[in-house]
Amino acid sequence: MANDKKKMVEAITAQEVDFAQWYTDICTKAELVEYSSVKGFVVLRPYGYAIWENIQKNLDARFKATGHENVAMPVLIPESLLKKEGELVNGFAPEVAWVTAGGSDPLEERLAVRPTSETMFCDHFSHVLHSYRDLPMLYNQWCSVVRWEKSTRPFLRTREFWWQEGHTIHETAEEAKAETEQQLNCYADFAEHDLCIPVVKGRKTDKEKFAGAEATYTIEAMMKYGKALQSGTSHYFGDKFSRAYDVTFTGRDNTLQYPFQTSWGASTRLIGAIIMTHGDDDGLILPPAIAPIQVVIVPVAAHKPGVLDKCRELAAEIGQYARVKLDDSDKQPGWKFAQWEMKGVPVRLEVGPRDIENGQCVLVRRDTREKQFVKFEELATAIPAAMEALAKDLYDRALQNRENRTYSATTMDEVKQLAKEHTGFIKTMWCGDLACEEAMKADAGLSSRCMPFAQEHLSDVCPVCGKPAQKMVVWGVAY
């Protein structure tokens, strides 16, 4: 049995040997993605897409609970429309893919394959918004977008990726700002409760904010070995896009006004976050809330009378409260154990003839590998309890890892020394000047992750220039 497991997992590079290769191995060996014949594009395989479907389902329920509606915008954007908002087009220009012909006929105007959909939403709003009575308009779209990245990695940075993008317009700036905050909190709640990933909430610096936004807010997660991953963003646009695209409405005082706008998005990058936060050298460890299979039943000595029948009976019962799979394939149990561990299934049940005689089975948690004997009649409480405990432990381990890898500095020498010796979050004060932010990158290799909402007073001055500090910033090395 041990040899079967070794054969199954030996192709996975150990995390401590080469974390980047380990990540790639997990993506392919766990059958999440397959590289396509188009460079930078991947195929989301059924298991990978099933994870994304659960992310979609759980997020979508949250969006609809706050009044948002799903829509679908065209995938192509006329160049003239994209150019109406200068900051946006300048921000995305290097990454835009263009359609220049339809069949064999050249197009009169180039069409951009959407890198994001602000322009199409604004164009739509300009046609359907008339009165303050139409507001707010709370829209969300599930789709893929294309950005011509130079360096790609599955889930983290691909030329096409799947995401949701919310776009809303409001009568007042206060309502739009409240929407921006609400959606950021939605992402944070989802990341921490469903994905078991602790996040830092904060505001991006002007250098790091979304092109064209007045303010960008973010949730930043720390991966296992200390690198940062931006895991969801929420943007407040003010009325800048409304003015650029002539989106107006008749206000309560019968004057023509511009609505205030937001956008917010999260993507399949979240799957990368799950892999790098929770995975181990044997594969994925999936949080139960988004696991395609929450419980796998593995028959032991399946050829013995009654074993498969009992497993089928258990699968039917468990299926009433959990996503369950009975692996009745002809592979050896040891191979199955290794396969489902690689795929990160939270709970495994082992059922053999002796177990059936004793009215029990073996329950194994994916994260601890600890085995416990559970009476069949107690599974309905034992399985949910095991999944709840696993989710809590995943979160607690990730939080402990973040705390262990978070440092504070008050001088540039301290920053450089910490950055040289450790990978993690470094907290410092900051004067607010772009030059000092760029010096952090040039001298210490760190980018600003955010100005956390939970501010601390570490010192009175900026460590770069010595001028009075305005905010505490979290710095790090990001994917």
What residue ranges belong to the model's regions?
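NTP/phosphate- and nucleic-acid-binding module
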Residues: M1-Y479
